[in-house]
Amino acid sequence: KEDGYLVDKTGCKKSCYKLGENDYCNRECKWKHVGGSYGYCYGFGCYCEGLSDSTPTWPLPNKTC
């Protein structure tokens, strides 16, 4: 299990605006294919705890965002 920023389909951080507890990020992190245990908004990106090892996290190699 790992912690990290979720990435969107472009490979950049999944954005959020309401910092701290954030229902959107929490829901996104807990999707079955993502496997996170908790999510919140930190630095305007959705940060997840307890992700499965197969879930990509930001920054991705060779991405400039």
Curated annotation (Swiss-Prot):
Tissue: Expressed by the venom gland.
Major subcellular site: secreted
Entry keyword Zinc-finger: no
Protein name per UniProt: Toxin Co52
Entry comment, domain topic: Has the structural arrangement of an alpha-helix connected to antiparallel beta-sheets by disulfide bonds (CS-alpha/beta).
SUPFAM superfamilies: Scorpion toxin-like (SSF57095)
An example Gene Ontology CC term for this record: extracellular region
Gene Ontology annotations of biological process type: defense response
Keywords: Disulfide bond, Ion channel impairing toxin, Neurotoxin, Secreted, Toxin, Voltage-gated sodium channel impairing toxin
Gene3D superfamilies the record matches: Knottin, scorpion toxin-like
Residues covered by the LCN-type CS-alpha/beta domain: 2-65
Chain's role: Beta toxins bind voltage-independently at site-4 of sodium channels (Nav) and shift the voltage of activation toward more negative potentials thereby affecting sodium channel activation and promoting spontaneous and repetitive firing. Not toxic to mice, chicks, crickets or woodlice (at 5 ug).
Molecular functions per Gene Ontology: sodium channel inhibitor activity; toxin activity
Disulfide bridge map: 12-65, 16-41, 25-46, 29-48
Alphabetical list of SMART domains matching this protein: Knot1
Subcellular location: Secreted
Similarity comment: Belongs to the long (4 C-C) scorpion toxin superfamily. Sodium channel inhibitor family. Beta subfamily.
Secreted in keyword set: yes
